[in-house]
């Protein structure tokens, strides 16, 4: 149910140009390839080795979905992108590759001609929705696969060859959305290979700026196939230097930080003064990958802030329990807020954003037209005077702090426009590196996207300035575990539909695609 505050408030219109930043220009993708020590992948028509284990690996990687026990279906499956020669090299009985959308690149072949190569008429008819012909190269396929028709139904896109398509994968613009390379390394090298795929060695940088990092590699194994070829499964990912900023800071805090007591009684290791920068261009979303971040919670909370809400029950009813501890009867009473109903947080973030300076009575009292609407004022400046240096939103109101369940940690954001791009600098006074900061990074990235939609700008950069950056003592070991993980490329944000007003966006309107994080690392919240 919508709150009375949300229904009555004067809303912020979404700009007519908002649709231009609703999705990335190209669909992110991964490469799957088997190559020998010299980069050989075949002779242009056949694969010069028989490794049944590689075939099983290929099927598993390109077919399996990320959710536990989730089976592919037309409403959610992966896509495999291949050249015409690769399609023709598939045994007819295996065309199309099952449980995947088969995207075939050809300058001449039509979908009907591709389907005609399937001998079984029943299977040919069934394959009509499983094959797409694209008249062009990999870039054209990725542009098609990021369209509204495919964004939600395709989980991961895999480029599976041949040689020309692989080369396109490592060149701009496609390389800019490369997420991973799954490689089967075959030994010894085959003398019959005439087609090669040169993958840059880990740690080296290509002219396009690609630097690959090895995430994993198996021990060398011997195939049961003819010839007993040796093989290894290797996964390479583009280096994510932006997430490395976060990991390096966490490591430095653990190793060099000052041991301090704190309000919660848990204790911290702390450093003072740090900064991280994250690009938001082309809808890249800085959602950390070295552990799963609760995106739905990030999105629901930010939209709750944006509407000026202060009733934590609105979040709790949606399964978002991040404010339950601070909204509990016991916690409110400990703050002297005995007149508040349970889950009334007082004049916290959203109230300050939309009603700064107004008197706060309770979360049930409408404050429409009272105080300063900082968000609306910033949007007005972004449109009318984008060079303004006063586009600041602050949640830190000293006069209202005693009435807040919790003083704001992320307390001030300044917006900046350059060359049609909107950037945001966040100042955070208290920075819980284990739990809070990953959440805050994604939250202010989303805020920047939404402010760009309201002002007709493109998202630029998020600059995160940290004051007291700390790791709680009971988070040290979980953080050490996280530091051992190789960060993967960030995902992308898609707005499935635009709204007339900024406050009308729902979590269901916003989707994160190609998010492939490591599993959750449990950390207890200090209250």
Curated annotation (Swiss-Prot):
Pathway: Pyrimidine metabolism; dTTP biosynthesis; Cofactor biosynthesis; tetrahydrofolate biosynthesis; 5,6,7,8-tetrahydrofolate from 7,8-dihydrofolate: step 1/1. Substrate binds at residues 32, 54, 160, 166, 184. One of its GO terms (biological process) is methylation. Its EC number is 1.5.1.3, 2.1.1.45. The active site is at 409. GO terms for molecular function: dihydrofolate reductase activity; thymidylate synthase activity. Keywords: Methyltransferase, Multifunctional enzyme, NADP, Nucleotide biosynthesis, One-carbon metabolism, Oxidoreductase, Transferase. It catalyses: dUMP + (6R)-5,10-methylene-5,6,7,8-tetrahydrofolate = 7,8-dihydrofolate + dTMP; (6S)-5,6,7,8-tetrahydrofolate + NADP(+) = 7,8-dihydrofolate + NADPH + H(+). Residues 243-527 are annotated as: Thymidylate synthase. DUMP binds at residues 263, 410, 428-432, 440, 470-472. It comes from the Eukaryota. GO terms for cellular component: cytosol; mitochondrion. Residues 28-238 form the DHFR domain. NADP(+) binds at residues 34, 40-46, 84-86, 105-108, 161-168. PANTHER family: THYMIDYLATE SYNTHASE, THYMIDYLATE SYNTHASE 1. HAMAP family: Thymidy_synth_bact. Homodimer. In the N-terminal section; belongs to the dihydrofolate reductase family. Bifunctional enzyme. Involved in de novo dTMP biosynthesis. Key enzyme in folate metabolism. Catalyzes an essential reaction for de novo glycine and purine synthesis, DNA precursor synthesis, and for the conversion of dUMP to dTMP. This is Bifunctional dihydrofolate reductase-thymidylate synthase. It comes from Trypanosoma brucei brucei.
């Amino acid at each position: 149910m919508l709150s009375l505050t949300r229904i009555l408030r004067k809303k912020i219109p979404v700009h007519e140009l908002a649709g231009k930043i609703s999705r990335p220009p190209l669909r992110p993708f991964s490469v799957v390839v088997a190559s020998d020590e010299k980069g050989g992948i075949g002779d242009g028509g056949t694969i010069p080795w028989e490794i049944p284990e590689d075939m099983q690996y290929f099927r598993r990687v390109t077919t399996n979905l990320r959710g536990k026990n989730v089976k592919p279906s037309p409403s959610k499956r992966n896509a495999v992108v291949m050249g015409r020669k690769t399609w023709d090299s598939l045994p007819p009985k295996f065309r199309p590759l099952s449980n995947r959308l088969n995207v075939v690149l050809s300058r001449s072949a039509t979908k009907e001609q591709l389907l005609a190569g399937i001998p079984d008429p029943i299977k040919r008819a069934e394959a009509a929705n499983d094959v797409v012909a694209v008249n062009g190269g990999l870039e054209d396929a990725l542009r098609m696969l990021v369209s509204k028709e495919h964004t939600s139904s395709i989980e991961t896109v895999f480029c599976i060859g041949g040689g020309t398509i692989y080369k396109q994968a490592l060149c701009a613009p496609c390389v800019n959305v490369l997420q991973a390379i799954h490689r089967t390394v075959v030994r010894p090298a085959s003398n019959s290979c005439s087609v090669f795929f040169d993958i840059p060695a880990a740690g080296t940088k290509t002219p396009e700026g690609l630097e690959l990092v090895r995430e994993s590699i198996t021990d060398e194994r011997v195939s049961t196939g003819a010839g007993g070829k040796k093989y290894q499964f290797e996964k390479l990912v583009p280096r994510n230097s932006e997430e490395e900023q976060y990991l390096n800071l966490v490591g430095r805090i653990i190793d060099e930080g000052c041991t301090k007591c704190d309000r919660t009684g848990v204790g911290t290791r702390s450093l003072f003064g740090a900064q991280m920068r994250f690009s938001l261009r082309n809808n890249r979303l800085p959602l950390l990958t070295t552990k799963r971040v609760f995106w739905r919670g990030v999105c629901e909370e930010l939209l709750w802030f944006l509407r000026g809400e202060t009733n934590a029950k609105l979040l709790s009813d949606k399964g978002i329990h991040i404010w339950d501890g601070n909204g509990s009867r016991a916690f409110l009473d400990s703050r002297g807020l005995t007149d508040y109903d349970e889950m009334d947080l007082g004049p916290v973030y959203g109230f300050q954003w939309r009603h700064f300076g107004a008197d706060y009575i309770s979360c049930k009292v409408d404050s429409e037209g009272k105080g300063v609407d900082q968000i609306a004022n910033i949007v007005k400046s972004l449109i009318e005077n984008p060079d303004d240096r006063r586009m600041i939103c602050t949640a830190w109101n000293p006069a209202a702090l005693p009435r807040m369940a919790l003083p704001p940690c992320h307390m001030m954001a300044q917006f900046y426009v350059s060359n049609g791009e909107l950037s945001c600098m966040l100042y955070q006074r208290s920075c819980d590196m284990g739990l809070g900061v990953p959440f805050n990074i994604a939250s202010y990235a989303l805020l920047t996207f939404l402010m760009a939609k309201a002002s007709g700008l493109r998202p630029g950069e998020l600059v995160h300035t940290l004051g007291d950056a700390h790791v709680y003592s009971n988070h040290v070991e979980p953080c050490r575990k996280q530091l051992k993980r190789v960060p993967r490329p960030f995902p992308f944000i898609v707005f499935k539909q635009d709204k007339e007003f900024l406050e009308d966006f729902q979590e269901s309107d916003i989707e994160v695609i190609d998010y492939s994080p490591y599993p959750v690392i449990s950390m207890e919240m200090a209250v």
